[in-house]
Amino acid sequence: MRNEMHLQFSARSENESFARVTVAAFVAQLDPTIDELTEIKTVVSEAVTNAIIHGYNNDPNGIVFISVVIEDGIVHLTVRDEGVGIANIDEARQPLFTTKPELERSGMGFTIMENFMDEVVVESEVNKGTTVYLKKHIAKSKALCN
């Protein structure tokens, strides 16, 4: 059975935790493990932070859009901005790459997303924005503790 939710909010860093908790609450209906839920929350944090810091250059007038679709035990997560876009997606996905070294960011956002999700697709157009599509299968059977 399909279920979906859509969320949009101002590109303010204090909204990152709101997005993370909201997505986690929605995904909880699948009864994910703590690890699965932590991975999803981390990925939401990374994608939203990228949109705020890189997409909108910390301009709080920007809007971050999140969509989550749950279908057949699969979480389809989309995080989109209408910011500056990414000129070279392949370069941006390299570990430790950052366009803002002065902020002492690690440049590991996309690497973390790729490690925690089953699929990551990034589409971007300069001066139009970036969309990150993420997919994760949630295990159906959970190990029982004795």
UniProtKB/Swiss-Prot annotation:
InterPro entries: Anti-sigma-factor_SerPK, Anti-sigma_F, HATPase_C_sf. Its EC number is 2.7.11.1. SMART domains: HATPase_c. The keyword Transferase applies. SUPFAM superfamilies: ATPase domain of HSP90 chaperone/DNA topoisomerase II/histidine kinase (SSF55874). GO terms for biological process: asexual sporulation; negative regulation of sporulation resulting in formation of a cellular spore; sporulation resulting in formation of a cellular spore. The gene is spoIIAB. Pfam families: HATPase_c_2 (PF13581). It catalyses: L-seryl-[protein] + ATP = O-phospho-L-seryl-[protein] + ADP + H(+); L-threonyl-[protein] + ATP = O-phospho-L-threonyl-[protein] + ADP + H(+). This is Anti-sigma F factor. One of its GO terms (molecular function) is protein serine/threonine kinase activity. Binds to sigma F and blocks its ability to form an RNA polymerase holoenzyme (E-sigma F). Phosphorylates SpoIIAA on a serine residue. This phosphorylation may enable SpoIIAA to act as an anti-anti-sigma factor that counteracts SpoIIAB and thus releases sigma F from inhibition. It comes from Geobacillus thermodenitrificans (strain NG80-2). It is an enzyme of class 2 (transferase).
